[in-house]
């Protein structure tokens, strides 16, 4: 029995981080040995423009299943909701995000969404991005950190993944955008700022009462 199987009470969310530059080869080895890399993942990896990108994708998939195994979840093909959110028909929530050489896996007692992005110059001109940024400043999130549109974008991504919605609906439907703003202002959802390095920003969206824990993927390798 793994340690995480003992967490049966209360609302919680754990975030696991992996450095694909230093751990990617080992993750691929584990993924192949434990048969974590199914036909659908391998097929998707073939669509990437370079071998490096394909290997990072497969390594992040191996990381997902390695983490889920810590919670007693065995490998199986993922099901996908109408807007692309993966599910396994289990009570726990989980989510994966990858940018550059970094991957994070969020596991929670209920729904969870996570997004990380490499800091870079981006042209995010959609009105909802500015509106979310203004809302974040108003509620004082994240504390002690600067606000920018890329950070607001990670919140938008995490929120839509939390709810199993497509980002296009948030961008195109005012009703969905208003719902997000209302949930941020009322603290119906909990936002966790992910400052993994000076070059990466991110956000995790969980239930409002979830106790958040942080884990290094290195201890699973």
What are these regions (language model features)?
Residues 1-221:
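Conserved nucleotide-ligand handling architecture
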